[in-house]
Structures are given as structure tokens and as C-alpha cells.
Amino acid sequence: MALSVEKTAAGREYKVKDMSLADFGRLELELAEVEMPGLMSCRTEFGPSQPFKGARITGSLHMTIQTGVLIETLTALGAEVRWCSCNIFSTQDHAAAAIARDSCAVFAWKGETLQEYWWCTERALDWGPDGGPDLIVDDGGDATLLIHEGVKAEEEYKKSGAIPDPASTDNAEFQIVLSIIRDGLKSDPMKYHKMKDRLVGVSEETTTGVKRLYQMQQNGTLLFPAINVNDSVTKSKFDNLYGCRHSLPDGLMRATDVMIAGKVALIAGYGDVGKGCAAAMKQAGARVIVTEIDPICALQATMEGLQVLPLEDVVSEVDIFVTTTGNKDIIMVSDMRKMKNNAIVCNIGHFDNEIDMLGLETYPGVKRITIKPQTDRWVFPDTGRGIIILAEGRLMNLGCATGHPSFVMSCSFTNQVIAQLELWNEKSSGKYEKKVYVLPKHLDEKVAALHLGKLGAKLTKLSKDQADYISVPVEGPYKPAHYRY
């Protein structure tokens, strides 16, 4: 696709695959709104006061129908918004078209190259010559990363005149990042400093991005305040767990039509995502094996009737492999060569480095057969056996299906709206330093409460005497910060 910005009749910038899909996208947005009570409650509660009036928000988060409802909640509260996806395969093109036509600048389409992906990220951050966004909604930390790397390069350029050299790294994706920063230096050597100086803060959606933020905080390199949305209970214990329980089998069946019952499934990692994936496979009738490094998580898995074994002990027995760890080098090409014919290998962690795709792509004589988009059979020349890789080792539930359902994403995205409001409302108070924060317990409970009515649930009320007996306020919060749900 030619990388040039287009404009709507109203003058709004965009780059999407097909604007003729906008009406279809609008119909699905209207369906999703009914399933997203938390976001709709935010519109009702905060819309009249327009708390985001004057705020610029950049989003780097999967451009799906559910994200469209989030975007239109932010604009309903007064924000100006520019958006890109955080994964090359996760955009739903009808959602991107509807939002680009009706609501905000969107730069996203399904099946981006890495070059296109980072171009879209740069466009979403580009608010013109007077700096970037006030706030960032990030998922995986790529928008945050680009600003940090840009500031670092500008400081080096100012000090020594050195410009980023893409050849200085073997990582093909980071070469693209350095090229973008290098080109930016030529037009404005303070471009990313201007962004950094304007930024109020970022709210981060997922485990991988949160890890990046805590690493920067530990190293003293974090440039602006950050709210860790991922570790809100109403995000990690719902989106990560129940969302993956729903979307993993959806992606598997859309991609392969595989019969899960009777198969052996291996789930690498037994955190919240792994728990949801293991539950889905077990409920579908698979025999589930878990790999784990953490003895506590391993013990939890055994208490659920799951086997816990190292990958190398069972690699030749497994039919379906799912990586969920957020770590790298979980399944290597040496493991793939030992797998049974047509074993399915997929990842539901954020990045594509859990499965050794580079090792597979460069294996001598390996043959790639594309069955359909995001479903490839790779055949090893020496064994004649093939394995099926989904979404090129990237997020399979969004690459091969449509991700998590609207209701569970309403929990996550309501946390995002609240986090963005918190950062914006406190921008001049000094409350938030260049550190990583989590939302307080009473807001977590509020997000949960907003979703109960839709499910027909009613809470029991404490009396004052009962509340005093267990030392909590009648109106909550009901659990201490350290409570493990």
C-alpha cells in the first residue's frame, strides 16, 4: 500500500484499507455498544462536562470494533484522537473505516508490513509542528518506545552530531524504528523532545507493555507518568482470563477447523492468559499439558487436573501448542522439527518472539505453504513433516479471529477511560511523577459494578454494623490492595 495520508470530506486524516466498509463497521459498532455498558456509562456520566476538551489523545491499540467504541467514548468526552493499531494483523478493516469516516484520524489496516506499521505509529503521534499528544493509550508500549528512542537519538545528535544507524542492529524491526527516527532528525532535530515535553502521561493496556514501563522506571529512563491498566483486577482477571478462554478456540477453529476434543494441547505459561487458554482447551475436550517456571503457578495447574511438564519431554506428543508467556524463545525451530506432522503452533502473547519464526524462516530448505491468510504450513525437507503456524507467530486470536468479545473488553476499556481521565485531571497537581502507577481499588470496584446490571446481577448490601465488624466502609472498597482475587 502506498504510504500517503488521505483526507475525508471533512478534512480528517486517515489511511485505511477500504472506506466503503464504513457502513458495515457502523452497524457492528452499534451492536457492540449494547455489550459495553462500562463505556456507555462513562459517556452518560462524563459526557455533559466534556472533561477531555482540549486534550489530544494518541492510541496505539488493536483497531477493532470494540476499540472503536472506546475511541468514540473518548471523543464523546471531548478529546481529539489519532489512532493506529499495535499489531500488523489485528485491525478489523470495517472498524477502521467507520471510525476514520465518523470520529477520528485512523492509520491502520489488516496485514501491514513492519514498515507500514511503524509509519502508522508515527502518523498517530504526529499532531503537527507544536508537539505531539497530551495522552497516550498504549498496548504493548510501541508508541511509548518510539518517543523514548527518539528522545535518546536527539540527545546523542545534539551532543555529538551522530545520527541513528539502522545497520547498528541485527533486529529488522528496530532497523525500521531507527530509520524513522533518523528521517525525523533531518526535518526537526527536537521532534521527540517536543512530544515528551507536552505529554501528560500514558496508560498501558497489556502485560508486555507494562514490563517495558517497569524496566524504564527501574533504569531511571521513564520520561513521563504511566498508569498500569493491565494490573487492574477488572482487566487482568477478566480480559486476560475470560477473554482468552473465549478467543483462543475461536481463532483455532477459524484458522484450521480442528477438532479440539481428544487432542493433546500444550499451554506454555500459566498466568492469567495461560489459565484462560488451558480452561478453554480442557472444556473443549483436550488433554492439557502446561509448561511453567513458577512453582506457584505450576501447583495451581496441577490442582486443576493439568499435567505440568517441560516442553522437551512432550514435544513429539502434542497436537496444539499455544504460547502465552510474554517471554522470548519459548518454542525454537529445534523443537518444531520434533513435532508430529501437522501440529498446530500458535501464540497469544503480545509479540512475535515467543515462537522462533526467524529460525524457521531461515531453516535450510524449509517450504512455506500458505493455506489461507495467517494460516501457513511449513514443511521440513529432512523429515517431510509439516507444522501449521498461525498468524506468523503473532497474536492468533486477533490475526485469525476477532479477538475478545465486546463485554469483557468493556471492562478493560473502562479502565482505560478512567486512567486517561485521572492523568488529565491531575496534570497540574504534581500527583503523578515519572513512575508507573495502578488505579486505586475503589475505581476497580466501580468498573466491576458498572457491568453487573447487564448480567442481571445484584449486590448484597452491608449494614453499618457488618461493615464495622470487618473494618471496611459500607460503600467499599471491600478488599485491601494486596488481596489476590
Curated annotation (Swiss-Prot):
SUPFAM superfamilies named among the record's database cross-references: Formate/glycerate dehydrogenase catalytic domain-like, NAD(P)-binding Rossmann-fold domains
GO cellular component terms attached to this protein's record: cytosol
Transmembrane segments: none
The protein's assembly and partners: Homotetramer.
Pathway membership: Amino-acid biosynthesis; L-homocysteine biosynthesis; L-homocysteine from S-adenosyl-L-homocysteine: step 1/1
Sites where the protein binds substrate: T64, D139, E205, K235, D239
InterPro entries: Adenosylhomocyst_ase-like_sf, Adenosylhomocysteinase-like, Ado_hCys_hydrolase_NAD-bd, NAD(P)-bd_dom_sf, S-Ado-L-homoCys_hydrolase_CS
Entry-linked NCBIfam families: ahcY (TIGR00936), PRK05476.2-3 (NF004005)
Tissue expression as described in the entry: Mainly in floral buds and stems.
Cofactor: NAD(+)
Molecular function GO labels: adenosylhomocysteinase activity
CDD domains cross-referenced by the UniProt entry: SAHH
Species: Petroselinum crispum (Parsley)
EC number(s) per entry: 3.13.2.1
Job of this protein: Adenosylhomocysteine is a competitive inhibitor of S-adenosyl-L-methionine-dependent methyl transferase reactions; therefore adenosylhomocysteinase may play a key role in the control of methylations via regulation of the intracellular concentration of adenosylhomocysteine.
Superkingdom, natural source: Eukaryota
Residues the entry annotates as binding NAD(+): 206-208, 240, 269-274, 292, 327, 348-350, 397
Catalysed reaction, written as an equation: S-adenosyl-L-homocysteine + H2O = L-homocysteine + adenosine
Designated name of the protein: Adenosylhomocysteinase
Key words of the record: Hydrolase, NAD, One-carbon metabolism
Cofactor binding annotation: Binds 1 NAD(+) per subunit.
Family the entry assigns: Belongs to the adenosylhomocysteinase family.
Gene Ontology annotations of biological process type: one-carbon metabolic process; S-adenosylmethionine cycle
